[in-house]
Swiss-Prot record:
Catalyzes the hydroxylation of L-kynurenine (L-Kyn) to form 3-hydroxy-L-kynurenine (L-3OHKyn). Required for synthesis of quinolinic acid. Its EC number is 1.14.13.9. It comes from Xanthomonas oryzae pv. oryzae (strain MAFF 311018). This is Kynurenine 3-monooxygenase. The keyword Flavoprotein applies. The keyword Protease does not apply. The lineage of its organism: Bacteria, Pseudomonadati, Pseudomonadota, Gammaproteobacteria, Lysobacterales. GO terms for biological process: anthranilate metabolic process; kynurenine metabolic process; L-tryptophan catabolic process; NAD biosynthetic process; quinolinate biosynthetic process.
């Protein structure tokens, strides 16, 4: 049994959020111990059930700065200026995310980021134990039992409080549910995903534009590619579970090859191992997790995907989890007891987590159905014009979510107003030449207050 220190916390899960939280709290004087069910990725290679490449935005970078980790992480990241949209017929077109290269996002491979944060967590003083799968928890006595799956040996610890940073399939959440129901609900999409890879050129370098997120939108399904710093692309096909085409009708490598030849012909020669990878990589599920509460008084708390998992279509799951880490560290500084800190953390983050979950679902429809739609493209043009004219009032949705740290709930509310303005102003128009700009100025000033941080 391990003794408990006065200012100690036990983290379950040494993934991205767990490692970042360990850095932040260790630097603030907490004694942090982390338990991870898998092995050390620095020794045995990286294993992860969900390895979609990560899009690092300003929210995530801000959290990394707080932890002194930004410089190390950014050395491994690749800039993405926008979406490179590949139509079925015609040339790819770049849709910029922002106004210039100061408004971009960054692609980073999950494994590289996890290893970097793990190193920094240990350097900050956190102790990390691998091959420790949470088995049972006695919340009243403050004891937890872990199992080493290599030899089935149990390991018991005494804890002051547990923080669940162990992802959407959280073992701590399951233990909390057994103690006191959390009102857990998971809504799965009727789509799943499969991950593939575009290798680098024989001499190194990218086979397609390296500073973009590539999208092949095809209505009810799509294919995306995110760059890595080694010249590869991590590519992901999102496909319905039933219907035509779907995972039900694309069961093997030959059927996958036929699908790509028909619907993604320019991508097919980029993926020489398509058939092999298709049969080796099982489809991954996509879902949104909601809970009625995230904590068990001061004894346990869930953060990140363990509390509010979301679909990956806004590139904000990691960024949101990193914001959680900073918010929790701040609440622990502000309160003398854990129960108050946990309650304040949940109160501060709940509405924002729900908002980004909703926006992530909406962004899937945009990426899949609308990026090549003429009405949507006209609205994008108007959005850029309105931002240029009134940059502190009409702040594009993507800017608020990705380049600023506007609260997600505020970004959602403002985005809904702005969408109404764009739809109404462009209705019946094929271009912007006949718009009533004076009327638009009145509407924008009446409905949108200046936004903090916008420029």
């Amino acid at each position: 049994m391990s003794p408990v220190s006065p200012r100690s916390l036990t983290l379950i899960g040494a993934g991205l959020a767990g490692c970042l939280l360990a850095i932040l709290l260790s630097r603030r004087g907490w004694q942090i111990t982390v338990y991870e069910r898998r092995g050390d990725p620095r020794i045995k290679g990286y294993e992860c059930g969900r390895s979609i490449n990560l899009a690092l935005a300003e929210r995530g970078r801000h959290a990394l700065r707080q932890a002194g980790a930004e410089e190390l992480v950014m050395a491994k990241a690749v800039m993405m200026r926008g979406r490179m949209v590949h139509p079925l017929v015609g040339e790819p077109q770049l849709q910029r995310y922002g106004r210039d290269d100061s408004e971009v996002i960054w692609s980073i491979h999950r494994a590289a980021l996890n290893v970097a944060l793990l190193d920094l967590a240990e350097q900050a003083g956190a102790r990390v134990h691998f091959y420790r799968r949470l088995h049972t928890v006695d919340f009243d006595a403050g004891y937890a039992r872990f199992i080493d799956d290599r030899d089935d040996q149990p390991h018991e610890i005494h804890f002051q409080s547990l923080i669940g940073s162990d992802g959407a399939g959280s073992a701590l959440r399951a233990a909390m549910q057994r103690k006191s129901p959390l009102g857990e609900r998971t809504e799965f999409l009727d789509h799943s995903y499969k991950e593939l890879e575009i290798p680098p050129l024989p001499g190194g370098g990218f086979r397609i534009e390296g500073n973009a997120l590539h999208i092949w939108p095809r209505g009810r399904y799509m294919f995306i590619a995110l760059p890595n710093d080694g010249g590869t692309f991590t590519v992901t096909l999102f496909l319905p579970n039933a219907g035509e085409p779907s995972f039900a009708t694309t069961r093997n490598g030959d059927e996958a090859f036929a699908l790509f030849a028909r619907d993604f012909p320019d991508a097919l020669p980029l993926i020489p191992q398509l058939k092999q990878h298709w049969e080796e990589h099982p489809p991954g599920l996509l879902g949104t997790l909601t809970l009625d509460r995230w904590h068990l008084d001061g004894r346990a708390l869930l953060i990140g995907d363990a509390a509010h998992a979301m679909v990956p279509f806004h590139g904000q799951g990691m960024n949101c989890a990193f914001e959680d880490c900073v918010a929790l560290a701040d609440q622990l500084d502000a309160h003398d007891d854990l129960a108050s800190a946990f309650a304040a953390f949940e109160a501060a983050r709940r509405d924002d987590a729900g908002a980004i979950q909703q926006m992530a679902l909406e962004n899937y429809l945009e990426m899949r159905d609308r990026v090549d739609d003429p009405e949507f493209l006209l609205q994008r043009q108007l959005e850029q014009q309105l931002q240029a004219r009134w940059p502190t009032r009409f702040v594009p949705h993507y800017t608020m979510v990705t380049f600023l740290r506007t609260r997600y709930s505020i970004a959602l509310a403002r985005s809904e107003i702005q969408r109404e303005i764009l739809v109404e102003a462009t209705r019946g128009h094929s271009d912007l030449s006949r718009l009533d700009w004076a009327a638009l100025e009145t509407i924008v000033h009446a409905r949108l207050e200046p936004l903090d941080g916008a420029h």
